[in-house]
Amino acid sequence: MVKAQGNVVAQNKKARHDYEILETYEAGIVLTGTEIKSVRAARITLKDGFAQVKNGEVWLNNVHITPYEQGNIWNQDPDRTRKLLLKKREIAKLDNELKGTGMTLVPLKVYLKNGFAKVLIGLAKGKHDYDKRESIKRREQDRDIKRQMKQFNGR
């Protein structure tokens, strides 16, 4: 499990609700000059994004980076596919894992680390409605227990 470090620019909160995250990977992302300026300004949306392995490379799809305002002719298509940078060993492992039924790669966070944009992608399996209700119920029970403990320890 890789933990995101650095300045978090965007998060995909819906991914943790809709998917069970089994493993996470930190990947670099290939961006143009105006795209990185938009990312630094936190003008990126991960909500509908997903990644896939094609020809031994990982590609990020449906991630919207708003065009940079001062970029005029240098701006790219906001919804274009972008290449993710991972080690060959990681790509091979992901390719094998994705062949399983119901598995997908979803972007969880975009953050800046040492001046470079990084994407935290998660190997995920879709949740059913009853799984979502169960996780909400578990979270509520944990909150109640913490509230009770805090109230008890406060006396």
Swiss-Prot record:
UniProt lists compositionally biased (Basic and acidic residues) regions at 132-147
| Keyword field | Cytoplasm, RNA-binding
Membrane-crossing ranges are none
Compartments (UniProt record):
Cytoplasm
Q: Name one GO cellular component term.
A: cytosol
Where is it mostly found?
cytoplasm
Classification via Gene3D superfamilies: 2.40.280.10
Specify the domain of life of the species encoding this protein: Bacteria
- Region Disordered: start-end pairs: 132-155
- Which named protein is this? SsrA-binding protein
The species this protein belongs to is Streptococcus mutans serotype c (strain ATCC 700610 / UA159)
